[in-house]
Amino acid sequence: MKICGPKLSLCGLIISVWGIVQLVLMGLFFYINSVALIEDLPLEEEYHSLEDFYAAANRAYNQNAYNCWIAACIYVLTLLLSAQQFYMNSRVTAN
């Protein structure tokens, strides 16, 4: 079933591949606790001890990594839909 045209399906393919690569890499960097991404963590302003801060930062890093990987999986679904549409459009124009 054709839902979108050939240009939109190709655009969806390109954007999906880029989104998958970017989100997988961001998830990896969050998972290894990259210091450059600490500004993106939902942390409180003050903590009672350094151990509390480290525990909260580790939880936030892991949660952000999982969120990135879940979003990458959603992009895989978009990639599959765009690929199916691209195939359907190329099949129609070949006939």
Curated annotation (Swiss-Prot):
GO molecular function, one term: RNA endonuclease activity
Transmembrane segments: 12-32, 68-88
Major localization listed first in the record, in broad terms: membrane
GO biological process, one term: cellular response to virus
Subcellular location: Membrane
Gene Ontology CC: membrane
Entries under InterPro entries matching the protein: RNase_K (IPR026770)
EC number: 3.1.-.-
Keywords from the UniProt entry: Endonuclease, Hydrolase, Membrane, Nuclease, Transmembrane, Transmembrane helix
Membrane topology: Multi-pass membrane protein
Organism domain of life: Eukaryota
Function text: Endoribonuclease.
Family assignment from sequence similarity: Belongs to the RNase K family.
Stated name of the protein: Ribonuclease kappa
